[in-house]
Amino acid sequence: MNTFALLSVFIQACLVQSVFSQCTSRAAVAADRGIIGGYGFGAPCGLAGGYGLEAPYGWAGYADYGYPAGAYGIDAYGGIGEGNVAVAGELPVAGTTAVAGQVPIMGAVKFGGDVCAAGSVSIAGKCACGCGDYGYGYGLGAPYLY
């Protein structure tokens, strides 16, 4: 009887953990003082705020003031190669995404289904997708700004 009771407690603990680990809404993540709330990642002094990662003097460099992030330092890897990325399921994203460096995309990008997006995107750099001289070295490839 003692072994059965102990096994029963372990099974109940696993069931309780399974029940309470399910994500039912974004309420806990996007709460007032959560990740994107008052004092979280998106706050005025957080990662995406006025003094954080995305700030003019943050990790994204001084690009807004005419000084690119990797102009005189070590630049990012060129990314010449081939790879496949497949994503299935829902991708709920809330907050700010800052990408510093190179994001090479060669080939086709296809979305199936509804893609709801709001906000703005600005891309500045060199094109490695066939416009210009391939963008494989310093000064090659036509610069662009969207």
Curated annotation (Swiss-Prot):
Keywords: Repeat, Signal. InterPro entries: Chorion. Residues 1-21 form the signal peptide. GO terms for cellular component: egg chorion. Transmembrane segments: none annotated. One of its GO terms (molecular function) is structural constituent of egg chorion. Pfam families: Chorion_1. GO terms for biological process: chorion-containing eggshell formation. This protein is one of many from the eggshell of the gypsy moth. Belongs to the chorion protein family. This is Chorion class A protein Ld3/Ld29. It comes from Lymantria dispar (Gypsy moth).
